[in-house]
């Protein structure tokens, strides 16, 4: 099976890819399901809130059927996987957004799961690591999805007030309401190489300002250059770096 890297457009043979699903030519991390990332990222994992279900608050036509189909395909109840994880005996609270579940969009269940994750971490005095991947707020849930931005941010504020560490890893893509809220609230903000990070999409921006924008305007490398994030980390180095950050953060918090 062949595929083309979305970043460098190199034609890749699927067997060339390692477990990390990284382009060997440019280090771009292909979009992967949350459970795939979990398989190599942590040593142990206890899942939270796996039975939460959306109630389709706006009775959007076809929405419930789409959710049910994606739940069967991804083995997730919504667009984020949350739980308590460990790396080399370092316990922490972990959230991984899944770009294969309605493009990781932020709905009521996703917002509730992330809020509960921070509440658990605050109660148990744990750091939070959150991998973001999202197209933004979920249109099928309207204003209810937008309210999740404020709800999650409040839980983050309480976690921060307790003096606890919050690490964000921006993956491709991180856009819309997720970027405008909890994706940029971290104490430490990392990003994968060439990840798309922004608010509005390229086409929307160009149609609004009536001019073209630089091709790399919303790249992880460009936002690092302008000081919006702390570091770009290759996918295969994430576990080792997170272990060091969690250990350093736990010592500082003692």
UniProtKB/Swiss-Prot annotation:
The keyword Lipid metabolism applies. It comes from Limosilactobacillus reuteri (strain DSM 20016). Binds 1 zinc ion per subunit. This is Acetyl-coenzyme A carboxylase carboxyl transferase subunit beta. Component of the acetyl coenzyme A carboxylase (ACC) complex. Biotin carboxylase (BC) catalyzes the carboxylation of biotin on its carrier protein (BCCP) and then the CO(2) group is transferred by the transcarboxylase to acetyl-CoA to form malonyl-CoA. The keyword Zinc applies. Keywords: ATP-binding, Cytoplasm, Fatty acid biosynthesis, Fatty acid metabolism, Lipid biosynthesis, Lipid metabolism, Metal-binding, Nucleotide-binding, Transferase, Zinc, Zinc-finger. It catalyses: N(6)-carboxybiotinyl-L-lysyl-[protein] + acetyl-CoA = N(6)-biotinyl-L-lysyl-[protein] + malonyl-CoA. Residues 1-254 form the CoA carboxyltransferase N-terminal domain. Belongs to the AccD/PCCB family. Its EC number is 2.1.3.15. HAMAP family: AcetylCoA_CT_beta (MF_01395). A zinc finger (C4-type) spans 5-26. The lineage of its organism: Bacteria, Bacillati, Bacillota, Bacilli, Lactobacillales. Pathway: Lipid metabolism; malonyl-CoA biosynthesis; malonyl-CoA from acetyl-CoA: step 1/1. GO terms for molecular function: acetyl-CoA carboxylase activity; ATP binding; carboxyl- or carbamoyltransferase activity; zinc ion binding.
């Amino acid at each position: 099976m062949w595929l083309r890297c979305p970043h460098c457009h190199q034609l890749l043979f699927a067997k060339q890819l390692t477990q990390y699903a990284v382009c060997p030519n440019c280090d771009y991390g292909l979009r992967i399901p949350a459970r795939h990332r979990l398989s190599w990222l942590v040593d142990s994992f206890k899942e939270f809130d796996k039975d939460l279900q959306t109630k389709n608050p706006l009775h959007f036509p076809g929405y419930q059927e789409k959710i049910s189909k994606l739940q069967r395909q991804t083995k997730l109840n919504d667009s984020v996987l949350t739980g308590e994880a460990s790396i080399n005996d370092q316990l922490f609270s972990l959230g991984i957004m899944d770009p294969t579940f309605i493009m990781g969009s932020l709905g009521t269940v996703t917002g509730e799961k992330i809020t509960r994750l921070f509440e658990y971490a605050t109660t148990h005095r744990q750091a939070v690591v959150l991998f973001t991947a999202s197209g933004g707020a979920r249109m099928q849930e309207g204003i209810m999805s937008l309210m999740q931005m404020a709800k999650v941010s409040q839980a983050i504020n309480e976690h921060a007030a307790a003096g606890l560490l919050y690490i964000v890893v921006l993956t491709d893509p991180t856009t819309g309401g997720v970027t405008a809220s909890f994706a940029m609230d971290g104490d430490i903000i990392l990003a994968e190489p060439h990840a798309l990070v922004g608010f509005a999409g390229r086409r929307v921006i160009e149609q609004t300002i009536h001019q073209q924008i630089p091709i790399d305007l919303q790249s992880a490398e460009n936002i690092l250059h302008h000081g919006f994030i702390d570091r770009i980390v290759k996918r295969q180095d994430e576990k080792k770096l997170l272990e060091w950050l969690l250990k350093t953060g736990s010592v500082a918090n003692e």
